[in-house]
């Protein structure tokens, strides 16, 4: 018989105040004869926001363990709008069913394919150890406070399936399950399992067909000795799962799992092969890959990522190969870019919403230093905060991106001057410091496509503020009097590696917008670009050659609406498509207008040449624009100029 004190659950659950120690992830709780799901506030709502409660069905609750959550205190309140919240006096405790049949013997022999159904608690070694070449049918029951992995499946051993709950188990690798052989489907509830070396709940060196269930509050038990000898002790990561073998599919919920050291992977660290990952990842944390770190191969990720955090890749860090990310949501992740790619990714089709980079390091949504074939979806409300010049918007590209087919709406950068009088944001410095609130590209070409659809780039801006309080995670807006620059895209002529001490390259970057099958791009925010040091004297600002060309291409049916300035472009080519200038009023009342400019207000000569070919159409909207200043002009192939008079 196990008493509740022996279960080791007093820390996060038993008799704890909700606002203090309830796990940060969503938790399902039974109160009386009803079942509820408790979802924590996301970081952007502030530290004082309340937990949201939703009633769920018995099937969703689906607890098959001999313990249950019990509400104590005054319980639930309802506000005027009908939202249900916990009262401030409410707290939880866990009751263990002491009448349950608790197993005290350790299974350490071949079960000849038979099933095991029992409750295991307090074992000093593996509760179930399947020897080499051993066979077990299905394992069910509950594993609470066992040591040295609750289930050990050895080399060439087989377990047909596991449907059990694992609470507060601990081992060096794989607190709940350590697999060297083959396991069919794994499902259940994994709470508060720990490891020192990685895979706090599941450590896989063999083959697992599917993994499902819930992984809540699994965390590393990293010791002083382990910190001193990480290479010897093989410390990796994986707050819930560390995979070095093969896994067919993972479809589960991961809440508040943590691995703070080495490769990270707050929920999953993959060093093997995973075919598919689905589910929801909430409030997981790691040094890299707040939810997932991939160092080898994943075929498909289709999941939701909320409020995960890391210094590198707040939701996902990829150093291997991911074939496709689709139908995914990255929202309210914080600390760095939601997706960090230093490997290869085929396609990304996702929504990136309100992700926050408050750690002074580059991007808020995607930082690409590898290869991405294509990006589609929506980037909205992503924010980057910085104390210096290293803040560059929703997407930063320092590698290769094949094409982008996406909307960029209301993404922003805030650069703080720390309140010092000598922190001068001159035009030259501003180009390096902020710019590209939607996308910044380092030494790499960019291509945007709109095939039979209308894409928008609007509401993106850079704010040079005077706020003194650095936003560690959630960010604050700059004080009044800050300067707003409505800039969406910035093309840097030098590479990201050269940013600290730039050596400007004689390379013309190419920015392409391709509109076909009636598709269009509407751009309401400015496009800007770096300059190159032609004479290699180290003073690029003295030269007049500019660092990017813009190509507008199509099949004769598309349109690019430029309600913004095209700054510092060398040559703009319109090829079998329409470029239409118009104007746009931003939320702060600023009016932007289509045009070509140097970006300086000192009377410099025009720097941009326009080339029209293959039935190109340049449409000037003369209600606001009566002059276009160009360095050069060429027209051929039945191209025409459209002027409203």
Give the residues covered by each predicted segment.
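Extracellular beta-strand/loop-rich repeat segments of large surface/secreted proteins
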Residues: 1, 468-472, 483, 490-498, ...
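All-beta strand scaffolds that present successive hydrophobic residues in beta-strands
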Residues: 2-6, 17-20, 31, 79-80, ...
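Glycine-rich beta-solenoid repeat tracts in large extracellular/virion proteins
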Residues: 9-21, 32, 50, 70, ...
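Short, structured coil/turn linkers that connect adjacent secondary-structure elements
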Residues: 12, 41, 142, 146, ...
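Extended, beta-strand-rich, solvent-exposed assembly scaffolds of outer structural proteins
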Residues: 26-44, 51-60
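Acidic, glycine-anchored loop motifs typical of Ca2+
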Residues: 75, 538
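Fold-core signature of tandem repeat domains
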Residues: 128, 136-139, 143, 151-155, ...
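Predominantly extracellular beta-rich ligand-binding scaffolds that present long acidic/polar faces
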Residues: 165, 188-190, 258, 277-281, ...
């Amino acid at each position: 018989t196990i008493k509740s004190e022996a279960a080791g659950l007093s820390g996060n659950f038993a008799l704890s105040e909700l606002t203090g120690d309830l796990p940060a992830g969503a938790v399902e709780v039974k109160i009386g004869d009803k079942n509820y799901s408790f979802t924590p506030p996301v970081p952007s709502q502030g530290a004082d926001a309340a937990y949201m409660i939703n009633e769920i069905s018995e099937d969703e609750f689906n607890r098959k363990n001999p313990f249950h959550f019990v509400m104590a205190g005054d319980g639930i309140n309802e506000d005027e709008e009908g939202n249900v919240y916990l009262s401030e006096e409410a707290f939880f405790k866990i009751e263990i069913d002491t009448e349950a049949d608790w197993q005290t013997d350790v299974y350490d022999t071949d079960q000849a394919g038979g099933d095991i159904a029992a409750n295991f608690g307090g074992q000093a070694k593996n509760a179930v150890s399947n020897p080499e070449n051993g066979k077990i049918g299905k394992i069910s029951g509950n594993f609470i406070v066992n040591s040295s992995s609750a289930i050990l499946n050895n080399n060439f051993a087989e377990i047909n399936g596991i449907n059990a709950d694992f609470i507060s188990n601990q081992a060096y690798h794989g607190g709940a399950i350590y697999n060297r052989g083959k396991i069919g489907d794994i499902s259940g509830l994994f709470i508060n399992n720990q490891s020192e070396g990685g895979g706090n709940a599941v450590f896989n060196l063999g083959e697992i067909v599917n993994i499902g269930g819930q992984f809540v509050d699994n965390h590393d038990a990293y010791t002083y000795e382990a910190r001193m000898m990480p290479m010897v002790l093989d410390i990796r990561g994986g707050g819930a799962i560390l995979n070095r073998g093969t896994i067919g599919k993972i479809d589960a919920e991961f809440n508040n799992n943590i691995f703070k050291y080495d490769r990270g992977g707050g929920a999953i660290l993959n060093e093997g092969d995973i075919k598919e990952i689905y589910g929801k990842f909430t409030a997981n944390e790691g040094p890299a890959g707040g939810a997932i770190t991939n160092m080898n191969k994943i075929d498909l990720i289709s999941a939701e990522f909320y409020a995960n955090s890391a210094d590198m890749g707040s939701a996902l860090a990829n150093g291997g190969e991911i074939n496709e990310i689709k139908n995914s949501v990255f929202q309210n992740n914080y600390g760095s870019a939601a997706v960090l790619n230093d490997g290869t990714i085929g396609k990304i089709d996702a929504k990136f919403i309100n992700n926050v980079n408050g750690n002074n390091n580059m991007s808020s949504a995607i930082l690409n230093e590898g290869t991405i074939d294509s990006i589609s979806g929506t980037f909205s409300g992503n924010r980057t905060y910085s104390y210096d010049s290293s803040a560059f918007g929703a997407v930063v590209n320092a590698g290769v991106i094949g094409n982008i087919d996406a909307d960029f709406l209301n993404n922003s950068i805030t650069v703080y001057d720390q309140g010092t009088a000598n922190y001068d944001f001159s035009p030259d410095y501003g180009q390096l410091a902020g710019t590209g609130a939607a996308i910044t590209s380092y030494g790499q070409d960019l291509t945007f496509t709109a095939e039979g659809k209308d894409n928008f780039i609007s509401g993106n801006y850079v704010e040079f503020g005077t706020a003194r309080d650095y936003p560690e995670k959630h960010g604050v807006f700059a004080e009044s009097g800050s300067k707003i620059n409505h800039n969406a895209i910035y093309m840097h002529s030098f590479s990201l590696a050269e940013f600290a001490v730039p050596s400007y390259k004689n390379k013309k970057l190419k920015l392409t917008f391709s509109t076909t099958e009636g598709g269009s791009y509407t751009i309401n925010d400015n496009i800007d670009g770096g300059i190159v040091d032609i004479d290699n004297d180290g003073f690029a600002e003295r030269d007049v050659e500019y660092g990017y060309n813009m190509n507008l291409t199509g099949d004769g049916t598309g349109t690019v609406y430029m309600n913004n300035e095209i700054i510092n472009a060398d040559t703009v080519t319109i090829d079998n498509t329409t470029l239409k200038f118009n104007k746009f009023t931003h939320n702060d009342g600023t009016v932007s207008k289509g045009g070509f400019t140097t970006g300086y207000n000192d009377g410099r000569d025009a720097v941009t040449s326009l080339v029209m070919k293959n039935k190109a159409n340049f449409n000037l909207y003369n209600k606001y624009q009566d002059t276009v200043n160009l360095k050069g002009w060429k027209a051929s192939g039945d191209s025409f100029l459209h002027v409203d008079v």
